[in-house]
Design a protein with these regions (language model features):
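Conserved helicase motor core of SF1/SF2 NTP-dependent helicases
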Residues: 3, 8-20, 26, 30, ...
Length: 226
């Protein structure tokens, strides 16, 4: 008899009416929105970049180190995440300039790139919060990860082709001046599925001889502005 009573009590506790559930969801949404950090542009270029974030699918930030390229990209991605508009942030970059020792480093591709993505991850931690980054950062094998899994992930630009990203995904591409033309073409085609692509690079720091991916994309956008 007591077992049945306990079972009924447990069911009653689990059964929560739709109104209460909606209130909980709304409270959680408001808490996330309150964590969105305001970012004041430091100059006209940053103001233009932030405006471009709002209605452009592909945004290229080109300039020397220290001008705030990745800071802006990470702030925007974090803002959309906390607003509930995206549920996947992909961090990608080439390993062209990392040297011949890259292949000898133990671990998965994501684990090999992790030390070189720390700057972006630190900025995401700043804008998302430690808990959100810890709970959503994925370091699983790529074959297992890129099914229906969501979260914050690292993937080498060399492996981006063939992976699918929808409109609830933002891709942050760093050091794109060291990507080849074919690699950025593969990256750009991800936009066909609806995701937003934020690319950062410095043309003066390229490890590519001849035209690099960053220069190629800039030339394309001059001819065919979107």
């Amino acid at each position: 008899g007591s077992t049945r009573k306990n079972t009924r009590k447990e069911k009653a506790a689990v059964a929560c009416d739709a109104g209460t559930l909606a209130e909980v969801k709304e409270k959680y949404r408001q808490e996330r929105l309150e964590r969105v950090q305001k970012l004041s542009p430091k100059n006209e270029h940053q103001s233009e970049t932030i405006e471009a974030f709002k209605d452009k699918q592909l945004i290229i930030q080109s300039g020397s180190a220290g001008v705030g390229k990745t800071e802006l990209a990470c702030w925007w991605a974090s803002k959309l995440w906390l607003e509930g508009k995206i549920d996947t942030i992909v961090i990608t970059r080439p390993h062209k300039h990392l040297g011949d020792d890259y292949g000898a480093v133990k671990g998965s591709d994501a684990e090999k790139l992790l030390p070189f993505c720390m700057s972006i991850l630190m900025k995401l931690r700043k804008h998302l919060g430690v808990g959100t980054l810890r709970n959503n950062f994925k370091m699983d094998r790529l074959d297992d990860l890129f099914g229906d899994a969501k979260g914050i992930v690292i993937v080498p630009i060399e492996k981006i082709q063939g992976l699918s990203y929808d409109s609830r995904t933002i891709i942050i591409g760093d050091e794109i001046q060291s990507a080849s033309v074919s690699q950025v073409k593969a990256l750009a085609t991800r936009m066909e599925e609806g995701c937003q692509l934020l690319l950062c690079g410095d043309k003066l720091q390229s490890a590519i001889s001849g035209i690099n991916g960053l220069e190629y994309l800039e030339q394309v956008l001059v001819k065919h502005p979107h």
